[in-house]
């Protein structure tokens, strides 16, 4: 039991809920994610995140991915820490259930997905295929880029297909979490 003063000191929010725990972080390096492809009886469905920086966006992506049935999320080494307090809060617990890995070399990770028969789709402003017109008949990986800059060119060029979300009005792009 902590005093209010100590609890306020160790908490990162102004109005904490009064519950806190200390846990050991899982090793989230990409060495084990290939095994998940082999275990999948159906078509695996991955997200590949390139340099996401906003903790709230990362949390929303993780939570939405769990709800959508994503098999796992592969992240570039320069993505925001999934154990950032804001990320954890915004996942509403999904961070503890969703398989997550950091890849030291995201390009090599995408190449490995492709070697495993996974079709890769880059979310890209110059996409030639509208996202809901693509045929998702095999294992799938969506490549999603940084909030301000999108996918790095070297990552985008590895994708089998570039997809886009058509937008009305004067909107140029959507939040990475969408």
Regions found by a protein language model. Give the residues of each.
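Active-site/ligand-binding-proximal alpha/beta "capping" segment
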Residues: 121-171
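Short, charged, surface-exposed secondary-structure boundary motifs
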Residues: 10, 109-112, 173-177
């Amino acid at each position: 039991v902590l005093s209010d003063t100590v609890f306020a000191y160790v908490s990162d929010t102004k109005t904490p809920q009064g519950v806190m725990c200390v846990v050991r972080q899982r090793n989230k390096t990409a060495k084990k994610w290939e095994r998940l492809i082999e275990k999948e009886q159906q078509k695996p469905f991955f997200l590949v995140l390139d340099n996401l920086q906003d903790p709230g966006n990362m949390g929303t992506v993780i939570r939405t991915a769990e709800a959508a049935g994503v098999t796992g999320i592969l992240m570039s080494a320069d993505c925001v820490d999934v154990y950032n307090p804001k990320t954890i809060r915004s996942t509403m617990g999904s961070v503890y259930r969703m398989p997550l890995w950091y890849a030291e070399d995201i390009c090599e990770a995408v190449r490995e997905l492709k070697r495993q028969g996974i079709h890769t789709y880059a979310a890209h402003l110059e996409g030639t295929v509208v996202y809901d017109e693509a045929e998702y008949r095999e294992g799938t990986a969506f490549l999603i880029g940084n909030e301000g800059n999108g996918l790095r060119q070297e990552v985008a060029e590895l994708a089998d297909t570039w997809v886009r979300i058509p937008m009305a009005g004067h909107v140029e792009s959507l939040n990475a979490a969408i």
